[in-house]
């Protein structure tokens, strides 16, 4: 079993210590970004859309519960960019390069370092494992067992699986991209995003109720 240790922030950098047996790996966010940079634009975009979409429920809940810290307009902006991204990924619609870069930045580079903090906050409110909202939602809606395989005690565990199992990195990314392509064929972008919003609205009362207990 993989155990996640301490998390420290140095400026904007996120450094994670991952304990695997007696071996402690120092994980720097820059390493994650470097790996993502090695993908083609299309692969990075697909991977970013997939990760961002799974993050949306967490971010939506956090914006509603902590409006003094997080700007809900950022969520709406991300939703709009995500819609454009799905159109790009599914229909080969050409998007201006700067727009594509903004999609990738907002989906991965800006939000990913905050995901552990977000997941921890939501977990404290809901008294549930952080990923039950994100990957659990993906499994419930899509019956995709791979989402359960990614589950651990922190979001985007696949980044760390990729890091620890270097030889499987390309395969994991390829599987993630193929999974996302399949999801795009099953559910149109607007309907999928609305489903995520409905899911959050329906579960908001449960989260707030548990937080008061």
What are the language-model segments listed below?
Residues 146-213:
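Glycine-rich, aromatic-bearing surface loops/beta-hairpins
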């Amino acid at each position: 079993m993989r155990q996640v240790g301490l998390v420290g922030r140095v400026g904007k950098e996120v450094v994670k210590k991952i304990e695997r047996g007696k071996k402690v790996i120092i994980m720097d966010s820059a390493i994650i970004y470097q790996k993502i940079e090695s993908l083609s634009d299309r692969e990075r975009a697909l991977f970013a859309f997939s990760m961002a979409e799974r993050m949306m429920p967490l971010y939506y809940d956090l914006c509603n519960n902590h409006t003094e810290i997080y700007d809900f307009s950022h969520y709406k902006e991300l939703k709009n960019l995500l819609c454009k991204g799905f159109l790009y990924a599914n229909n080969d619609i050409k998007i201006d390069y700067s727009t594509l870069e903004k999609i990738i930045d907002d989906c991965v580079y800006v939000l990913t370092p905050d995901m552990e903090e977000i997941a921890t906050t939501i977990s404290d409110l809901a008294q549930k494992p952080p990923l039950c909202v994100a990957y659990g939602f993906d499994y419930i809606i899509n019956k995709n067992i791979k989402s359960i395989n990614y589950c651990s005690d922190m979001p985007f565990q696949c980044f760390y699986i990729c890091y620890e199992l270097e030889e499987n990195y390309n395969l994991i990314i390829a599987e993630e991209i193929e999974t996302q392509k399949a999801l795009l064929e099953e559910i149109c972008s607007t309907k999928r995003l609305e489903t995520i919003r409905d899911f959050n609205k329906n579960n908001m009362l449960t989260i707030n109720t548990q937080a008061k207990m």
